[in-house]
Amino acid sequence: MDKQILVIGGTGMLGDSVTRQLREDGFKVRVMARDLQKAQAQFGAAYELFAGDVTDLGDLEQALAGCYGVHISVGGPADQISAENVAALAPELGLEHVTYVSGSTVRDENSWFPMTAQKLAAESAVSQCGVPYTIFRPTWPMEQLPRFVRDGRATLVGDIKTPWHWFAAADFGRMVANA
């Protein structure tokens, strides 16, 4: 397959599974990473690696050059700006698909929480950029379960009224690659 996909956030837990699945499915994969040494240690020479910052439009434009699509899997402060920057560049660069990782609790009624407000703004930018897109709102990857256990006891946050639905990061990688 000749389609090149840029993965932003490919060194993270979910980004890693997406990166590996895309390559397994025959896509050419370019990983944009702030820490090139970490990316090299994680992926070796099998992937095209691009050192850059998603908040820098010049870096992002270079990373997206020649790509069919892009997957955004960024957390923290760069999440919203990375999606907005991709949305600004995607039409002019001829991207044909954008995928973005949001979250299961990202809804208007939760916009009082800063991270949720940022995710909503990122979703809006992606959905309005004019390029076909898929937004994923996953729950919790089961690989995170150890973070919920302290001293042999499970930690629960809030008044849990509905069951949590866990997923495997590898399954998520397959869903994104299929999109």
What kind of region is each of these model predictions?
Residues 2-44, 55-58, 65, 77-78, ...:
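Oxidoreductase cofactor-interface core, primarily capturing Rossmann-like NAD(P)-dependent enzymes
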Residues 52:
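Cofactor-binding loops of NAD(P)H-dependent oxidoreductases
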Residues 64, 68-71, 99:
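N-terminal Rossmann-like NAD(P) cofactor-binding module of classical short-chain dehydrogenase/reductase
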